[in-house]
Amino acid sequence: MDPKYQRVALNDGHFMPVLGFGSYAPPEVPRNRVVEVTKLAIEAGFRHIDSAYLYNNEEQVGLAIRSKIADGSVKREDIFYTSKLWCTFFRPQLVQPALESSLKKLQLDYVDLYLIHFPMALKPGETPLPKDENGKVMFDTVDLCAIWEAMEKCKDAGLAKSIGVSNFNRRQLEMILNNPGLKYKPVCNQVECHPYLNQSKLLDFCKSKDIVLVAHSALGTQRHKLWVDQNSPALLEDPVLCALAKKHKRSPALIALRYQLQRGVVVLAKSYNEQRIRENVQVFEFQLTSEDMKVLDDLNRNFRYVVMDFLVDHPDYPFSDEY
């Protein structure tokens, strides 16, 4: 089997490719560019495509996937597609319609994975970040277990092959796992994870529960000003990472991606640069030594790029706990 297509078994019997393409692009990127780069990613060897309602690009990503199926490059079952339920649809009766709306945009019959994007409910409606007259984001209170039960119904209906969560901390995961009516465990928890925030405790916890950790922002984010402090350190310029890159004759990005794969983490690589998209698939062509891994572990400083500070007062804000 081509190493590019390495997959990990999920706790529900499905399989997830260990390298994924993160499709988020800032609003200033033209939407037709999304179609081009998603096609490029599939041509380069990516089989796992990660998107979300919030990214406002599912029509374009769906078009790219369907065109690569139409030209015979891939079959639908070769592609592992992830979408995410946004926080303004956190009412049990809104969950399946939200997924159906994503499927309509994608023009696909099912998603391979549907995630709860963040554990924080916002006021229901069509505005992704609903604000009051003072410009404060409007929260909602819900029982996350009731939302999870609605996710389970999406799986039963065949609209999502697998279901999981994103940006949940240990306490929030345990709440779902301990729900007396639990039918399906989350297959994964997708969280920010990179050498500056290696999530070792959360990773150990997830492994103990047979939940896959998926790393977003694995290259330190695109530093989009809505989400990321512009003074935050640039991960890919880290001297230790750059020294390892030089040693292996690879880019710092490849070292950061390889680090995750060797820890048993599924990693998402986000790039809209054609050369880097092709380069990121080379992550299967080399290995880091145990000494290299230790050096990378030592870079951890529990530094989070995506803090979502405008939601810090939310009762379900996930990042105040240690992990």
UniProtKB/Swiss-Prot annotation:
The active site is at 55 (proton donor). The record marks 54 as: Important for substrate specificity. One of its GO terms (biological process) is lipid metabolic process. Coiled coil: none annotated. High expression in liver. Also expressed in kidney. Keywords: Cytoplasm, Lipid metabolism, NADP, Oxidoreductase. InterPro entries: AKR, AKR1C, Aldo/ket_reductase_CS, NADP_OxRdtase_dom, NADP_OxRdtase_dom_sf. Pathway: Steroid metabolism. The keyword Lipid metabolism applies. The keyword Lipid metabolism applies. Substrate binds at residue 117. One of its GO terms (cellular component) is cytosol. Potently inhibited by benzbromarone, 3',3'',5',5''-tetrabromophenolphthalein (TBPP) and o-cresolphthalein. It is found in: Cytoplasm, Cytosol. It catalyses: chlordecone alcohol + NADP(+) = chlordecone + NADPH + H(+); a 3alpha-hydroxysteroid + NADP(+) = a 3-oxosteroid + NADPH + H(+); a 3alpha-hydroxysteroid + NAD(+) = a 3-oxosteroid + NADH + H(+); 5alpha-androstane-3alpha,17beta-diol + NADP(+) = 17beta-hydroxy-5alpha-androstan-3-one + NADPH + H(+). Monomer. Belongs to the aldo/keto reductase family. Cytosolic aldo-keto reductase that catalyzes the NADH and NADPH-dependent reduction of ketosteroids to hydroxysteroids. Liver specific enzyme that acts as an NAD(P)(H)-dependent 3-, 17- and 20-ketosteroid reductase on the steroid nucleus and side chain. Displays the ability to catalyze both oxidation and reduction in vitro, but most probably acts as a reductase in vivo since the oxidase activity measured in vitro is inhibited by physiological concentration of NADPH. Acts preferentially as a 3-alpha-hydroxysteroid dehydrogenase (HSD) with a subsidiary 3-beta-HSD activity. This is Aldo-keto reductase family 1 member C4. The gene is AKR1C4.
